[in-house]
């Protein structure tokens, strides 16, 4: 098996004494793999994402990114090697669509023509023809279109790791299902590792090859969607996945 792109080993994180947000958190994400973090609010999902890009530092344990301790590279350099997709795309409102997609390549010093070619290719990939959308501004886009731009921006510098925090949570159900299907198609052509946080277990089942169920800062089970349905580790996992026992389209 290829070396993990992202690995947590026995990680602990607290914001107040005696109240761990993450405890003995151990998880690895391999190249080309999508792993979803699910669980109730406050279970530590977003904290794990922030540890991966050093918006937070662990109190104990180790976090490795790209085969080295996460504290080794300078934080800005680390973050430029990671793609991010968040709710509503997180676009810069006064930048055009193309300027938004070019954000990280611009920071990395790519020449203008290379940035343009990459941005236009990605806009085509996410279903936004550049001739129609490159010069638009975020306010001129629908929610689904903004989210597609957010995905294109995350992939612009071909990062080996993509972090997704509730990326499609603000979309209506029809738009959400459409972009989920498109994400699966895009993902097949990428080698990036993806760590996805979502409150929607059906979304995790559709998009992720493996799912980690968190509760009170601990991982209760890591497995495929089928593992969670058929072999839940305990009563909490069983109840958590109960409403999703009917087959759904999955990433596997």
Language-model region placement:
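The feature captures the beta-strand-to-loop junction immediately N-terminal to the Walker
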Residues: 38-40
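Helix-to-loop junction immediately C-terminal to a conserved catalytic motif
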Residues: 53
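ABC ATPase NBD coupling module
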Residues: 69-83, 107, 112, 228-232
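Conserved ABC ATPase signature
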Residues: 136-141, 145
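Conserved catalytic motifs of ABC-family nucleotide-binding domains
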Residues: 158
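ABC ATPase "signature
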Residues: 222-223, 231
């Amino acid at each position: 098996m290829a070396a993990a792109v992202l690995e947590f080993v026995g990680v602990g994180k607290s914001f107040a004494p005696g109240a761990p947000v993450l405890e003995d958190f151990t998880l690895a994400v391999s190249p080309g793999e999508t792993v979803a973090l699910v669980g109730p609010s406050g279970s530590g999902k977003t904290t794990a994402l922030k540890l991966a890009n050093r918006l937070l530092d662990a109190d104990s344990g180790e976090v490795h990114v790209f085969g080295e301790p996460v504290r080794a590279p300078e934080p800005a350099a680390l973050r430029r090697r990671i793609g991010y997709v968040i709710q509503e795309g997180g676009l810069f409102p006064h930048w055009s669509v193309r300027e938004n997609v070019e954000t990280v390549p611009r920071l990395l010093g790519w020449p203008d023509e290379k940035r343009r070619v990459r941005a236009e290719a990605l806009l085509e990939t996410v279903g936004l023809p550049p001739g129609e959308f490159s010069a638009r501004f975020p306010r001129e886009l629908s929610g689904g279109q903004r989210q597609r731009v957010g995905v294109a921006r995350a992939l612009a510098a071909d990062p080996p790791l993509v972090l997704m925090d509730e990326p499609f949570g603000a979309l209506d159900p029809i738009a959400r299902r459409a972009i989920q299907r498109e994400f699966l198609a895009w993902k097949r052509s990428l080698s990036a590792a993806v760590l996805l946080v979502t409150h929607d277990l059906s979304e995790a089942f559709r998009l992720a090859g493996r799912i980690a169920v968190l509760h009170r800062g601990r991982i209760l089970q890591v497995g495929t969607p089928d593992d969670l349905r058929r072999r839940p580790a305990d009563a909490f996992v069983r109840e958590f996945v109960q409403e999703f026992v009917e087959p759904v389209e999955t990433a596997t």
